[in-house]
Amino acid sequence: MTIISDEYMREMMTKTKPYCVVLLKAGPNWKAAERDKIIWEHGRRNFELRAAGVLSIVCPVRDGSELSGVGIFNATVDEVSKIMDEDPGVQAGIFVYEVHPSRSFPGDSLPA
């Protein structure tokens, strides 16, 4: 591994910016008959949010746990809460969510 100096760390920390992390979990209506259709529309909305530059990273979680997904938003906590409240999966009770303020490095991405 590359050795990272204290000076480098201090410099890099000045380059962070605020983001929000959303933890999406199974809601009370997870087993609803219309679940697949609603999740499909939830996914469509995620693509729209990605195209708008608001949802920077979206990661569905499929390990059988209550966690359904993780998203990193380029927006404030209040903006993200409003976005999530309008999500079709949240409105149908398929999902519930938590929003957490965070910081990260602009330009970071998932490897190809």
Describe the residue ranges of each PLM region.
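Conserved, structured core segments of small domains
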Residues: 1-112
